[in-house]
Curated annotation (Swiss-Prot):
NCBIfam families: PRK00033.1-3 (NF000670), PRK00033.1-5 (NF000672)
Protein name: ATP-dependent Clp protease adapter protein ClpS
Family in the record: Belongs to the ClpS family.
Organism, scientific name: Escherichia coli (strain K12)
GO BP, sorted A to Z: protein catabolic process; proteolysis; response to heat
Length: 106
């Protein structure tokens, strides 16, 4: 009887590992935050360059940032979201703009 229980435990462990491996990754929202100094054209440029939006959609999102204080640029896995946030913030600083990009769990 001991062997049967060992196999059941092993099977249960294997099923749990497979279930854990198949879980979808955690997703994160990448958010642009409004400020009073970054030009609207620069925000549109950021949305096109880093999020691949066309000029029309980038303009809509820029206006959402401007009037609502922030807007979600996209939802990504943690690694992608962290990379996009870092790249946008670096690009903004290199161009001497205070634009802030953040992330939060979706």
């Amino acid at each position: 009887m001991g062997k049967t229980n060992d196999w059941l435990d092993f099977d249960q462990l294997a099923e749990e590992k497979v279930r854990d491996a198949l879980k979808p990754p955690s997703m994160y929202k990448v958010i642009l935050v409004n400020d009073d100094y970054t030009p609207m054209e620069f925000v549109i440029d950021v949305l096109q360059k880093f999020f691949s939006y066309d000029v029309e959609r980038a303009t809509q999102l820029m206006l959402a940032v401007h009037y609502q204080g922030k807007a979600i640029c996209g939802v990504f896995t943690a690694e992608v979201a962290e990379t996009k946030v870092a790249m946008v913030n670096k690009y903004a600083r290199e161009n001497e703009h205070p634009l802030l990009c953040t992330l939060e769990k979706a």
